[in-house]
A protein has these predicted regions:
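N-terminal Rossmann-like FAD-binding beta1-loop-alpha1 element of flavoenzymes
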Residues: 131-159
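Helical element adjacent to the flavin cofactor pocket in flavoenzyme catalytic cores
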Residues: 293-363
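Glycine-rich loop(s) and the adjacent beta-strand/alpha-helix scaffold that form part
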Residues: 149-175, 198, 204, 316, ...
Length: 615
């Protein structure tokens, strides 16, 4: 998959590419691991009667080219899986980084103002059972804000987090180690469908705010108005004070164009040539040193995730954080939620308590495990009715890369830096997004030596992410072994919108001076300005798109009992004292990075609980 070429080492001979990947796979669930093994085994056996690993280099490249040109969607899925895993371990090898000129520094800049990293107190469960007024499941944007709001109002709060706590003193040094430690299922959660879509989410103290790009958008006014009109969320138009308070506390500011890096500047220049509306992205990372390492945890905690913002506030007000505890069932007595039963110590070797751990909540139980974890817990508990886990939206996204004659060195910049909202009526948001080679290398064009040439060219690559506010839907369910199962069906209409967005991203690249564009659609290959019209005239099947998604939402949505899981106050239909406070509540796709909307919802819902207590 990665032969020697022009100074790049051969993966099989010169680089230990399998070791780091094996460590990553050790972090995934048995079900995910079995599916990965099945896919890679199928790839190995496809050249029947031979095996891929026993073919000559020339035969391998010929076979890979035929797979890439095939009309069979399953071939493209297996090929992409093989490329991703081959690149994961290879891309982080020092020999590869040195050859492509990759170097970055995440040291604090002079005069910077990093967020203090604690304290978060003793996070070990105090015995097999504890009591509190309110138990909060999850420590991400929803759970952390709810915990801070409730604790500062004088309530006794316990926050449960399945993952570990990290900060700038102890983030893993290597990217794959960080992915294994910080993400659920080692970042390999997949929404099954055609195409299958990776949906990586965090499992760590602070949730996905630890590994996201720090992008801060308010929910569009039109979306909030729709939620008020169609789903009865009367307060949806009253969130401006919540947004403003969060922006002030998190020190959210628009990115200085001088600091966004060349990748963002090229997107800005291309959009300006086209007259497309957009602007620098607002972020909660004033001390950012532009190292583009956001998905591995900020090594200097310049990004004000929940672990260095709202959670310390909650703990300072008396909340107790418990890590390494996986919530398994909401406890119900006489129609009232009374707490949560957990497995303690299963995911955190530093946790002193192992076995069953129970939290009894006198007043309320808040579930904020994200749009995957929240329905998973509700389903295990037999709660939420027929709608639990349904209505999954994910903002399917496509990486659109381009080659520039000039050096871009996108890793020396902010991961997400510039947005283009010109095509919002088409439900599209474009964001200049650059990820390190370990994350993005598998999406580069070509196979074999062609893919190696793309890796050599990585310093000349610019990239734009095309995000769709999807009408397509999926579902979270439980597999036969009790593990989470995600599925998603991309409609033809949404596939057409994504293809339109890819063409617009290509236009921006060409307007900024790119010589060729890589659209990440099966059998399309490389685009030039002359081929763009032909591309736009082509209709693509959903299965031909290569997508990722980072914003799951809607799986416990606010709607009537027949169409949703929760009422407008976040309470689960039919259960007293049980609330949801995360992106699961969103009735439809929010259309922008959801962190700030989650914060506003959590603040509103937890604030209402305080108001009810105060009478």
């Amino acid at each position: 998959m990665a032969p020697a070429l022009d100074g790049l080492p051969a993966a099989e001979r010169d680089v230990d590419a399998s070791g780091p990947v094996a460590e990553l796979l050790a972090a995934v669930s048995p079900r995910t691991l079995s599916r990965i093994k099945l896919g890679l085994r199928a790839f190995e056996l496809l050249p029947f009667p031979w095996r891929f690993s026993r073919l000559s280099l020339a035969a391998r490249e010929d076979f890979l080219r035929r797979m890439e040109g095939s009309r069979l969607g399953v071939y493209h899925e297996l090929l992409l899986m093989a490329k991703v895993f081959a690149t994961l371990g290879y891309a982080v090898a020092p020999e590869v980084e040195q050859r492509i000129g990759f170097e970055t520094s995440c040291r604090l800049a002079d005069g910077s103002d990093p967020q203090p990293s604690g304290p978060l107190g003793n996070t070990k469960p105090a015995g097999e059972e504890e009591e509190c007024d309110v138990v909060v499941v999850g420590s991400g944007a929803g759970g952390a804000v709810a915990a801070a709001t409730l604790a500062e109002a004088g309530l006794d709060v316990i926050v449960l987090e399945a993952g570990r706590s990290f900060n700038r003193e102890d983030y893993p040094d290597q990217p794959l180690d960080a992915i294994a430690a910080l993400y659920r299922d080692g970042g390999l959660t997949i929404a099954e469908g055609r195409p299958p879509i990776p949906v990586p989410v965090a499992r760590t103290v602070g949730g996905t705010t630890v590994v996201n790009s720090g992008t801060c958008f308010r929910a569009p006014a039109a979306v909030l108005a729709d939620w008020r009109r169609r789903f009865g969320i009367e307060w949806a138009g009253e969130l401006d004070p919540c947004f403003a308070e969060a922006e002030q506390f998190l020190r959210v500011t628009p990115l200085d164009p001088e600091r966004m890096g060349r990748n963002g500047q090229l997107a800005m220049e291309g959009a300006a040539v086209l007259g497309a509306s957009g602007g620098p992205i607002s972020r909660n990372a004033g001390s950012c040193v532009q190292c583009s390492s956001c998905p591995f945890g900020c090594e200097i905690d310049a990004k004000r995730g929940m672990h260095v913002s709202y959670l310390p506030r909650a703990v300072a007000a008396g909340a107790r954080l418990r890590t390494g505890v996986e919530a398994r069932r909401v406890l119900i007595e006489a129609g009232q939620a009374t707490g949560v039963r957990c497995i303690a110590g299963a995911l955190d070797s530093r946790n002193g308590c192992r076995g069953t751990y129970t939290v009894r909540a006198r007043q309320a139980t808040i579930v904020a495990g994200g749009a995957l974890g929240t329905p998973e817990l509700l389903l295990r508990s037999g709660l939420g009715g027929r709608q639990a886990g349904r209505n999954l939206h994910i903002h399917p996204a496509c990486w659109v890369g381009a080659r520039y004659d000039e050096e871009v060195r996108g890793w020396n910049g902010v991961m997400q830096s510039y947005y283009v909202d010109e095509w919002e009526p088409q439900r599209l948001l474009l964001e200049a997004t650059f990820t390190p080679l370990a994350f993005g290398g598998g999406w580069l064009q070509g196979t074999g030596r062609e893919h190696q040439r793309a890796i050599l060219d990585f310093g000349h690559i610019g990239s734009i992410g095309v995000h769709l506010s999807d009408e397509s839907q999926g579902r979270i369910g439980l597999a036969g072994d009790g593990s989470l199962r995600a599925s998603y069906k991309l409609t033809s209409e949404d596939a057409d919108r994504l293809a339109f967005g890819i063409a617009r991203a290509a236009e921006i690249h060409f307007a900024a001076g790119a010589t060729e564009v890589y659209p990440n659609i099966a059998r399309v290959g490389t685009l030039t300005p002359k081929r763009l019209a032909e591309f736009e005239a082509t209709s693509f099947k959903p299965s031909e798109l290569r997508l990722e998604a980072f914003h799951p939402m809607g799986t416990a949505r606010i709607a009537s009992e027949s169409e949703g899981v929760c009422g407008p106050d976040g309470s689960v239909h039919g259960v007293k004292g049980l609330h949801v406070a995360d992106a699961s509540l969103f009735p439809t796709s929010v259309g922008v990075n959801p962190m700030m909307t989650v914060i506003a919802f959590a603040q509103r819902i937890s604030g209402e609980l305080v108001r009810q207590r105060d009478g």
